[in-house]
C-alpha cells in the first residue's frame, strides 16, 4: 500500500532503470486522485489478492527539473480546499460546497508574479495557482472534464489561475473554476502540451505528487510519453 509520496519515490527509482518493471500499487490518501483516473479499485483486499495480474496501462511521467513526478506538480491557492471540504457539505451543496470553503481561504491567498513559456508563447502575469497534471482530479476535485484527460497521450493539462481583484473578482474566478471555464483567458492560462518553463521573481513553494517539492525560481517540466506501465487488477 502506498501514499502519494511513496509512489513518487518509487517512480524516481524506476525511471533510473534501463529495464523498467510494471508497477502495481494499493492507493492510500491523496493517491485516490490518480487511482480514479486509471480506474484502479480502492478495495484493498481485492487489490492485495490480484496486484500482480490485470490489464496493463502505459502512463506518461513528468520531469520536474532533475526529478520525476507521477501525476501533478502544483503551487498556490486552493490546494487544501478539496481536502477540508466535508462529504456532508458536498452532499448538501454539490459543487457549491467548494465555493463555501474556498471563501475562508481568501485572506491567505498570495499571488506570484511568474513568466510562463509554453507552445512558443511567453506570458507574464500574477497567478494565485498553477497545476501541471496527468489526472482527472487533483486534491479530490475534478478540474477537467473526464473526456479531456488521457494519461498516455504525451501531454499534460496545465492550468494557471490569474490573480482576481476584490471579492467580486474572487467570486467570479471560483465559479469559473467550478464550471471548468478554462479557456476564458480573463481568469486562466490553460495549455495541453508536453513541456513548459516557469520563472518567478521569488521562489515558489511547489507540491509534487502531494508532497513538498521545494522552493524554486525556475522550473522546467516535460512529459515522457508512456514511460512506465501500471497493472490494473480486474
Where are these regions (language model features)?
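Catalytic core of DAGKc-family lipid kinases
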Residues: 12-132
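Short glycine/serine/threonine-rich phosphate/pyrophosphate-binding segments
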Residues: 6-10
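Gly/Ser/Thr-rich active-site loops/lids in small-molecule metabolic enzymes
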Residues: 89-96, 142, 146-165
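Short beta->alpha junction loops/turns
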Residues: 3-4, 40, 74, 163
Amino acid at each position: 500500500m502506498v501514499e502519494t509520496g511513496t509512489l513518487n519515490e518509487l517512480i524516481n527509482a524506476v525511471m533510473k532503470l534501463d529495464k523498467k518493471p510494471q508497477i502495481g500499487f494499493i492507493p492510500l490518501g491523496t493517491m485516490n486522485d490518480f487511482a480514479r483516473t486509471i480506474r484502479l479499485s480502492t478495495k484493498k483486499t481485492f487489490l492485495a489478492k490480484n496486484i500482480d495480474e490485470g490489464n496493463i496501462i502505459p502512463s506518461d511521467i513528468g520531469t520536474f527539473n532533475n526529478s520525476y513526478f507521477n501525476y501533478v506538480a502544483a503551487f498556490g491557492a486552493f490546494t487544501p480546499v478539496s481536502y477540508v471540504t466535508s462529504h456532508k457539505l458536498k452532499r448538501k451543496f454539490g459543487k457549491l460546497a467548494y465555493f463555501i470553503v474556498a471563501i475562508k481561504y481568501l485572506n491567505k491567498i498570495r499571488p506570484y508574479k511568474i513568466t510562463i513559456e509554453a507552445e512558443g508563447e511567453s506570458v507574464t502575469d500574477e497567478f494565485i495557482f498553477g497545476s501541471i497534471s496527468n489526472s482527472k482530479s487533483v486534491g479530490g476535485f475534478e478540474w477537467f472534464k473526464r473526456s479531456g484527460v488521457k494519461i498516455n497521450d504525451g501531454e499534460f493539462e496545465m492550468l494557471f489561475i490569474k490573480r482576481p481583484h476584490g471579492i467580486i473578482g474572487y467570486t467570479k474566478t471560483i465559479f469559473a473554476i467550478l464550471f471548468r471555464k478554462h479557456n476564458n483567458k480573463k481568469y486562466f492560462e490553460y495549455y495541453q502540451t508536453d513541456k513548459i518553463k516557469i520563472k518567478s521573481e521569488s521562489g515558489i513553494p511547489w507540491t509534487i505528487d502531494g508532497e513538498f517539492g521545494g522552493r524554486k525560481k525556475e522550473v522546467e517540466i516535460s512529459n515522457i510519453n508512456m514511460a512506465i506501465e501500471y497493472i490494473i487488477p480486474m
